[in-house]
């Protein structure tokens, strides 16, 4: 074990001069970012100004490279960190904080999946320590970008019912929300004020399904007037989404953009990201 704490900075790798495009340099930096860190030295966990800030910068770089490179970079990092369990657990806690926490502006499920996959294969964790990552990995796989969204039944205020799969439109915008929540109201406002979204709805290119997943029906009914009349506004009468863990409800509101076959195009997106996608594709 290394006793003397001499850590003051994170030494980044020197990028070879022959790599002269932004893409090449970002790719190299992502793959070799942690090469100069000796993860056998647990003193790194006591220096958030070095290690945590280094992690934040690393995640920023991963946004600039292909998904396959980001996946390799994260898994390589965690393999390197297996030299010292304290360092390993510290890095996975940073992944929880920045990539998984619903309040993190850097939240990124695809990157977090890479971390979870590494944890599940790691010899440094025992079976008990793998229970939580296994459950999170299972939930993350549901409604993942590129997969088909899970079907469910919704109920309207008049008692009529429908299913997600029965909605016919080039695009479906699924908006899971709670009535009266501030972030939900902000999202409703942003979608209502978007000319792109409004026009797409008017032209029947997009159907919006607003879904309330909880049990306080009186509260939901009280806020029905908050929603545009051309949205489908339903609730989950039998609480199937919650009980069967069909959708990840830790972050409310949640927006999913689906294609005509209900394949997920955008997951946990912002109203701005939805608008931008529709502008480019409609």
Model-found features: residue ranges?
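Short acidic-hydrophobic, aromatic-tinged amphipathic segments that line or gate anion-handling sites
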Residues: 155, 232-236, 268
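Oxidative protein folding and maturation machinery
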Residues: 1-160
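Short active-site neighborhood of thiol/selenol oxidoreductases, capturing the structured segment around
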Residues: 162-191, 207-211
């Amino acid at each position: 074990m290394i006793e003397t704490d001499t850590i003051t900075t994170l030494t980044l790798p020197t990028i070879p001069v022959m790599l002269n495009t932004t893409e090449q340099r970002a790719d190299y930096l992502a793959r070799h970012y942690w090469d100069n860190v000796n993860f056998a030295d647990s003193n790194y966990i006591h220096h958030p100004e070095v290690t945590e800030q280094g992690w934040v910068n690393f995640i920023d770089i991963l946004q600039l490279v292909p998904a396959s490179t980001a996946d390799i970079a994260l898994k390589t990092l965690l393999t390197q960190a297996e030299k010292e369990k304290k360092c390993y657990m510290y890095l996975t806690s940073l992944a929880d904080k920045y990539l998984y926490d619903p309040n993190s502006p850097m939240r990124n499920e695809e990157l977090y999946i890479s971390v979870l996959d590494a944890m599940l294969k790691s010899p440094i964790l025992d079976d008990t320590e793998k229970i939580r990552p296994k459950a999170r990995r299972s939930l993350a796989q549901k409604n993942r970008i590129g997969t088909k969204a899970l079907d469910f039944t919704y109920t309207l205020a008049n008692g009529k019912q429908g299913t997600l799969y029965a909605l016919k439109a080039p695009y479906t915008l699924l908006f899971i929300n709670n009535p009266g929540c501030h972030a939900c109201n902000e999202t409703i406002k942003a979608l209502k004020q978007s000319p792109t979204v409004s026009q797409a709805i008017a032209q029947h290119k997009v159907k919006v399904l607003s879904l309330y997943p909880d049990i306080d029906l009186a509260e939901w009914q009280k806020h029905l007037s908050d929603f545009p009349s051309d949205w489908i506004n339903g609730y989950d009468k039998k609480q199937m989404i919650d009980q069967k863990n069909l959708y990840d409800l830790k972050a409310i509101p949640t927006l999913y953009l689906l294609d005509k076959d209900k394949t997920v195009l955008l997951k946990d997106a912002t109203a701005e990201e939805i608008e931008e996608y529709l502008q480019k594709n409609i």
